[in-house]
């Protein structure tokens, strides 16, 4: 564009120079014509003036010739300048085309660079979004890992606690098993004593059937026997209540160590009550033996009274046997429940007790091996004098 502007300026300048030369030549030619015309019109022009005029004309001719030469030179120069201008114009146009092509190429390059930049910017933004998403996933994974580690620690603590509780439970199970074995031995002894008591009562019935005591003495003996029977029944009822209490306490769920200790104490207390009931039964049997002796001393009853007394004694003995049989069934059932409890796995702490199931063993409990054995009573039969 600059080259084009300069070329146009040169062309304008050359045009102005050519126009000036042409106007100057025309002015000089006009002056010569005017002088000749003036001479021709004035016939009185002096010779000197004419000569001067001729010289001037010659001079003007020379000048005109020189001006023509200059004009040709100027025209040639102008033509050269025009050629140069055309050449410069062509070069400028070529350069302009080249520049335009260069500018188009530059524009295309800039467009390509802009496109690449936009593409890279989009890729960078996509990578940033992807990185943010990955970071979010990573944060979520870290949170999940932390939660799992916390859960693992909690489970490890729970397993450790369960392991300790299992050790305590195993120790308490062993202790309670020993106590249960001792309790079974005690129940066997109770059953044996009850069997002896039944045999003694049968013997008393036989002795009463053959006694010839007097009515008054027999009535006293009968009242005493009934009282003794009531005491025995009371003792058996206490024994039944204590055994029921033991069963109910066995049905309590896997409780704490203190609860198991209380249950064990209650079982021991029940055993003491059983021993006490046996002692009372022994004392009542001793009273019956004393009554039998008194019956032997008084033999004044009639056959009818003997039959009535025998019927009453048989009825009472039958009722007592039924009660003893029922008590034996309950003891057998209790033994079966305890045997099944010893085979079942320990319940977890905090669960409710299921009826009919035994309690979990208590840690630290000791078997009743050091307890004093049940007092073995010796009784002498009044009829034969045999000691049992």
UniProtKB/Swiss-Prot annotation:
Query: Topologically, how does it sit relative to the membrane?
Result: Peptidoglycan-anchor
Which residues get modified to Pentaglycyl murein peptidoglycan amidated threonine? 384
InterPro entries referenced in this protein's UniProt entry, alphabetically? Plasminogen_ligand_VEK-30 (IPR021965), SMCR (IPR049896), SMDRR (IPR049895), YSIRK_signal_dom (IPR005877)
Pfam families assigned? VEK-30
Q: Does the keyword Signal apply?
A: yes
Q: Which Gene Ontology BP annotations are present? A: plasminogen activation
Which intervals of this chain are the motif LPXTG sorting signal?
381-385
Disordered as annotated region, ranges: 95-189, 204-231, 248-269, 331-388
Q: Does the keyword Transmembrane apply?
A: no
Q: What ranges does the record give for the region Able to bind plasminogen, renumbered to this chain?
A: 85-113
**Name of the protein in question:** Plasminogen-binding group A streptococcal M-like protein PAM
Q: Which organism is it from?
A: Streptococcus pyogenes
Gene name, please?
Answer: pam
């Amino acid at each position: 564009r600059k080259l084009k502007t300069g070329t146009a300026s040169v062309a304008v300048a050359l045009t102005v120079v050519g126009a000036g030369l042409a106007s100057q030549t025309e002015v000089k030619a006009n002056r010569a014509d005017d002088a000749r015309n003036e001479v021709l019109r004035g016939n009185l022009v002096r010779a000197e003036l004419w000569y001067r005029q001729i010289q001037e004309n010659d001079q003007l001719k020379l000048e005109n010739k020189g001006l023509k030469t200059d004009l040709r030179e100027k025209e040639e120069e102008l033509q050269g300048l025009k050629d140069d201008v055309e050449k410069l114009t062509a070069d400028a146009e070529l350069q302009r085309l080249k520049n335009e092509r260069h500018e188009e190429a530059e524009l295309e390059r800039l467009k390509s660079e802009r496109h690449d930049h936009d593409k890279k910017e989009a890729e960078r933004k996509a990578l940033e979004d992807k990185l943010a998403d990955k970071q979010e996933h990573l944060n979520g994974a870290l949170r999940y890992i932390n939660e799992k580690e916390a859960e693992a620690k909690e489970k490890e603590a729970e397993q450790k606690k369960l392991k300790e509780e299992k050790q305590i439970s195993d120790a308490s199970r062993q202790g309670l098993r020993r106590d249960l074995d001792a309790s079974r031995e005690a129940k066997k002894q109770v059953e044996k004593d009850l069997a002896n008591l039944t045999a003694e009562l049968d013997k008393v019935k036989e002795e009463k059937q053959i006694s010839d005591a007097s009515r008054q003495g027999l009535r006293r003996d009968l009242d005493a026997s009934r009282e003794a029977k009531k005491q025995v029944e009371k003792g058996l009822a206490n024994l039944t209540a204590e055994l029921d209490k033991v069963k109910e306490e066995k049905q309590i769920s896997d409780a704490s160590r203190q609860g198991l200790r209380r249950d064990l104490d209650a079982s021991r207390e029940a055993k003491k009550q059983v021993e006490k009931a046996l002692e009372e039964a022994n004392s009542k049997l001793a009273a019956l033996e004393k009554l039998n002796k008194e019956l032997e001393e008084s033999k004044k009853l009639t056959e009818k009274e003997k039959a009535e007394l025998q019927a009453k004694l048989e009825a009472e003995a039958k009722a007592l046997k039924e009660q003893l049989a029922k008590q034996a069934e309950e003891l057998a059932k209790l033994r079966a429940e305890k045997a099944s409890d010893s085979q079942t796995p320990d319940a977890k702490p905090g669960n409710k007790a299921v009826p009919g199931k035994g309690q979990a063993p208590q840690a630290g409990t000791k078997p009743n091996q050091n307890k004093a054995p049940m007092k073995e009573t010796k009784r002498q039969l009044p009829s034969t004098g045999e000691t049992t």
